[in-house]
Structure formats: structure tokens, C-alpha cells
């Protein structure tokens, strides 16, 4: 599998242990990623925690900040906004929520997005989410609300 074979992968939330990479709407090699994995328990108990802890693992392995990863993500986001999203795909970035997917309006969260290539982006709203996915998104949304509350005196 090559990265170009992956479509519609969205990560909801923030770069933290509560972020939620949605496999239920992800397409790999033309097939639904979640349905292609026979062991859904593995997804929930091993894959998701591994992804959620990846940032901490990188910091531990490097013995330093993951600032270079953040810089790369920023560059990738600028490129995604400057070019039209490929047909049938999305790109992922954190933007201010409008209430989509149960993430309260006014907080920044990762969403599946489309770009027209002229700097205009929009949230893709056609993802069907299971109760499991909704519960994971609620956890990350609550974390973001708590973080917003912690800095409310600064904004």
C-alpha cells in the first residue's frame, strides 16, 4: 500500500492521546479500511492507542520536541489549501468547528476538509459515524473544551 492509495482518512480532535483517526470512512486500495480489517478488537485496543500515543513516542525516541513534525504538518496543510483536493478524497487539518460531527462550535479540531485550490476550504459532512466513533470524537471534543477553559482568561 502506498500513501496515494489511501482516501478519506480523517483525524478528529487535536494532536493528543484523545485524537481519533476514523477508519470507518477511510478507503485503502478501493476498499473500506475498517471493513477490510477482520479483527475490530485489534483496531480499538491496539491500533487506535498506538496512533494516539505516536507523538509521545516520537518525542521519547528523539529525546527532543516534535517541532519538526508540526512544521511538516503546517507545510502540508498550506499545500493542501493551495491545491484542489483530489477527487474522492479529503485532507485533514484543524479548523474552528461549526458544530459538525458533534464538536462544539468555536473550538479548533481536526476535520475532513475539501479545498477548491483558491484558499477556500469546507468541512466534508458526509461521514457516517458509528456510536463507537461518535464516543471517541466526544472524548476528544471534551478535552478541547477543557483546554479552552484553561486559557479563557488569556483570550
Language model features with spans:
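C-terminal substrate-binding/catalytic lobe of Rossmann-fold NAD(P)-dependent dehydrogenases
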Residues: 1-155
Amino acid at each position: 500500500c502506498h500513501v496515494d492509495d489511501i482516501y478519506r482518512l480523517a483525524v478528529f480532535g487535536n494532536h493528543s492521546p484523545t485524537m481519533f483517526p476514523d477508519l470507518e470512512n477511510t478507503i485503502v486500495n478501493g476498499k473500506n479500511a475498517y471493513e477490510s480489517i477482520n479483527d475490530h478488537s485489534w483496531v480499538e485496543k491496539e491500533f487506535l492507542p498506538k496512533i494516539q500515543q505516536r507523538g509521545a513516542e516520537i518525542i521519547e525516541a528523539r529525546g527532543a520536541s516534535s517541532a519538526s513534525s508540526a512544521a511538516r504538518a503546517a507545510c502540508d496543510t498550506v499545500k493542501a489549501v493551495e491545491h484542489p483536493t483530489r477527487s474522492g478524497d479529503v485532507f485533514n487539518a484543524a479548523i474552528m468547528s461549526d458544530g459538525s460531527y458533534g464538536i462544539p462550535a468555536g473550538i479548533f479540531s481536526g476535520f475532513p476538509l475539501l479545498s477548491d485550490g483558491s484558499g477556500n476550504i469546507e468541512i466534508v459532512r458526509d461521514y457516517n459515524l458509528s456510536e463507537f466513533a461518535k464516543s471517541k470524537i466526544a472524548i476528544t471534543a471534551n478535552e478541547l473544551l477543557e483546554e479552552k477553559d484553561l486559557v479563557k482568561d488569556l483570550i
